């Protein structure tokens, strides 16, 4: 144990040296057991450059739990079980005591309260309490993942940052009144093409991210260049962002190669005025100054680090997220999830009692959960002939254009040269065929793997009603017509255009949709 403590401390020492060498601002988030350790206190007070930041890391250990007068339930002083290591495992009153204990100790040591607090996940009650009482300005949580370390966060705002709902910190809010005014930045830098499908068919996903310990991702210069090209140089709407770094539990010997490669790259991009390097607190303050509600953002990846020709575009707003994927000569909407601030977290009022936590949003298209092997779920464009037969269309050579700060246009052609345009707005998306071929007959068609349970309850001409985890929601067709599957059909529903255009509203506000949870 003594050697483990030494390795953890050595890692932070080396990280401090590295950011100081390049005079970069950095944020060090301290778990309570590190906060009360004089070694870390002295190091960060005396060695860290003065434009860096010290904040809180909200993974709960025995010293903090016992300082709050709560019985420790773990077999060791640190465990990864969600109902012990995270705030979701405690009552609301206990969550507040845990915050008060940490804040008091932090102020005793550093003379002020932390502005930034991060974790793999912080529940809405805790985060709201941190803001209401201590006025934190920024938070961060884990990238989307399924089952990794026992933690599932799926369907959320992909990359960048969002204001969370007061009743569900994973769910972006739609209104100022319904949000916690603390932006949550998504950590770790997911591979825009490959992270989503990793581990499909297995109990948990692997990791393909900017984290410097991963040989085929954040440790690989080619992958880092590929990732940063998407973040720095491609269309992104309001802004783009990535978090670089690694928790010290991975130790310096495992992260040094990747981190010592990444930091000079970031420093060079900063000197070229292509990026700003900021503390988490600075980014949070900037976000709050610029955005009263969650903005629309995008991540555009049109080159493939693996040389397979795959491409992807992510769009996020406070109402929904959507993902387009070009893969192995095919094209589809791989993902669409709606956001609704009224969808309460299961952990809002009561503690979780298992070693996992699960957070979801409202699925419309789920290319991971509804796929099996090579049978990939997605919303595809199909051409229909007079006999009722169909042909899946592949849109290729995409051109991605920003129209203002909240509208993204993706233009592409099918194999016969028919142009299509997909436009993402904050509240809706549109798919239009621009072909001069007046009788071009096409549709959007949702297909999923056999045997997958879907949330759709009633399919109407203008709406698909759905229910997920007891919460009702609706996908509304503003232009076009929705068709139920016919007997023997291989699709879940089909959307036909009107005047060669389909418009889908993603605000979940149709009057006859009663939300219950």
State each model region's role.
Residues 91-166, 427-431, 467-469:
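Catalytic domains of cell-wall/extracellular-matrix polysaccharide-remodeling enzymes
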Residues 214-223, 240-245, 467-517:
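Beta-strand-rich recognition/accessory modules
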